[in-house]
Amino acid sequence: LPYAWTHMIFGDTVLEKGGFPPPGDEKMFHLGCQGPDFLFFHRFWPWVKDDRVSRLGSAMHLRRCGPFLRDLIEEAKEKTSIRDAVTGFITHHILDRTTHPYIHYRAGYEGYNHQRMEVTIDTLVARKLAGIETWRTPLAPRIDVGPSLPEAWTDVFDRLARKHYPEETENIRREELNEAYRDMLKALRIFYDPWGIKRALTLGKIDPFRHTPYFPHRDYLNESESEWRHPAVPEETHRESFWTLWERALEEATGIVRKTREYWSSSEKAFPETLRRAIGNISYDTGKDCDLNLVNKAADPIF
């Protein structure tokens, strides 16, 4: 979760911009703001060769993104206890699909450069927008909802994952969602290293995941508005800074959360067509329609 602070701050900003009430369960909201990323931490130890749950996380970023999110919203109409998590999930999806093309293009695909890019952006965003120094502020307590995920959330997530991703979930037990959540908290506690002791003990192996105040001075946020290309459609050129993309995502997420809340509070059972269109079926990774099956390949790495 190298991007965790950014997603939490974005979620908080959506609620503030929209004039929405604060979440009833802030930790659950902030956990929801991490979207499906917690799945990538299942059995994250380098000596454990088991990527079943991680593969589900990858599939959720690339396929049936819209239908899964719409089903989550529909479930939360009746199951009010999961609304904080679902609202956070919405904000995660919108920020990812808006900013990931830029991040992929500037990070490239070698080693852990994607994580390194997101860790750096996390530090810059948290410092500017929330006055938080990520390297000396523990993250795990902000999304620690207890020893296990709430039953209602686990039930819904598991059932919808099996509906939309039958191949990836075939060999995954429901309890492994809780394992992934607990492994995420373990990883965040390991990566929290304000004094550099763990970095020394691991011979620098945690560097791509560790927040630090020290990194090379480069234009990570494209504040110079230099040209960059869409990594999956390289003929499509852009000049937006990260902040421009942030504002675009903020506008879109605020509108979708508003439509979602209106749906939840209405007596209408049918899913609103305006909300369906606003969500679409957009890949978290490419920001394009999932049905196009595009793959990010182009890059001009900043590292």
Q: What kind of feature is each model-predicted range?
A:
Residues L1-V86, H93-F303:
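N-terminal leader/auxiliary helical segments
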